[in-house]
UniProtKB/Swiss-Prot annotation:
Organism, as annotated: Variovorax paradoxus (strain S110)
Annotated localization: Cytoplasm
One Pfam family hit: Methyltransf_25
Chief site of localization: cytoplasm
Function text: Catalyzes the S-adenosylmethionine monomethyl esterification of trans-aconitate.
Gene: tam
Entry GO CC: cytoplasm
GO BP term (any one): methylation
Protein name: Trans-aconitate 2-methyltransferase
Catalysis performed (reactions): trans-aconitate + S-adenosyl-L-methionine = (E)-3-(methoxycarbonyl)pent-2-enedioate + S-adenosyl-L-homocysteine
Keyword Cytoplasm in annotation: yes
Family per record: Belongs to the methyltransferase superfamily. Tam family.
EC number: 2.1.1.144
Keywords, comma-separated and alphabetical: Cytoplasm, Methyltransferase, S-adenosyl-L-methionine, Transferase
């Protein structure tokens, strides 16, 4: 997959930052010395963490050079590192908070990943995770449906496999509960008013649609996006104010390690 586009991602930054704020609000730590923001993107979540824990050493990690450049421009005083979550491990002392907002859905093998991240915490530390749970929403079902048709099917191939199939929420609880002092899990469906079908397509182009479009040559990108937008227009009815409501389910997990 090509590198991420921070400018495209930030077009809906307020909507993307809201679940990050709500995840952080449920972190049961009055203070923290070491905080890691896994998959920090353009630094919007890292900024929240730095404001919540002003005396902490906050480190943002991402596997995208473009996202890290955007994050460094936003927070020049913060520390950012190029890193793959699948192989990440603390470089020195164990962190008090490992925070991953809208990142782990791109990382495979959650049955091994989640316990490994939890084990990396300091005693009493917290693992906080938010992941989009929208694979069966019309936006994502239509991505796959159009991608399965000619002339797009052959170049797109198995792009959908780049995103991990999430466990049921109870599955994450079961992974963490035996070693945790407390586990808090919940599910929220946001309803985002969008101007039109084109705005919905623009939103998902910054994330979930990217692996599909990246595999297409320029001429097929245009036709794929046009057909996808046509179907999105049919799937999301116009509301009384002329807008569309984009339902966006998200999964939240906050687990605290025993002291």
């Amino acid at each position: 997959m090509l590198d991420w586009n921070p400018a495209l991602y930030r077009r809906y930054e307020d909507e993307r930052t809201r679940p990050a704020q709500e995840l952080l609000a449920r972190v049961p730590l009055p203070e923290a010395a070491r905080v890691v923001d896994l998959g920090c993107g353009p630094g919007n979540s890292t900024e929240l963490l730095a404001n919540r824990f002003p005396t902490a050493k906050v480190v943002g990690t991402d596997n995208s050079e473009a996202m890290l450049a955007s994050a460094r421009e936003r927070l020049p005083q913060a520390r950012f590192e190029l890193s793959d979550i699948a192989t990440w491990a603390p470089q020195d002392q164990a962190p008090d908070l490992i925070y991953a907002n809208a990142a782990l859905q791109w990382v495979p093998d959650h049955e091994q990943l989640i316990p490994r991240l939890f084990a990396a915490l300091a005693p009493g530390g917290v693992l906080a995770i938010q992941m989009p749970d929208n694979r069966e929403e019309p936006t994502h079902r239509l991505m796959r449906a159009v991608a399965a048709e000619a002339p797009w099917a052959e170049p797109i191939g198995n792009a959908d496999r780049l995103r991990t199939l999430l466990l049921p929420l109870g599955g994450y609880y079961d992974l963490l509960a035996p070693a945790a002092a407390r586990v808090d899990v919940w599910h929220t469906i946001y309803q985002h008013p969008m101007a039109d079908a084109a705005a919905i397509v623009e939103w998902v182009r910054g994330t979930g649609l990217k692996p599909f479009v990246d595999r297409l040559p320029a001429d097929l990108q245009a036709s794929y996006l046009a057909e996808y937008e046509r179907r999105v227009d049919q799937a999301y009815p116009v509301r009384t104010d002329g807008k569309r409501l984009l339902a966006f389910p998200r999964m939240f997990i906050v687990a605290q390690k025993k002291a």
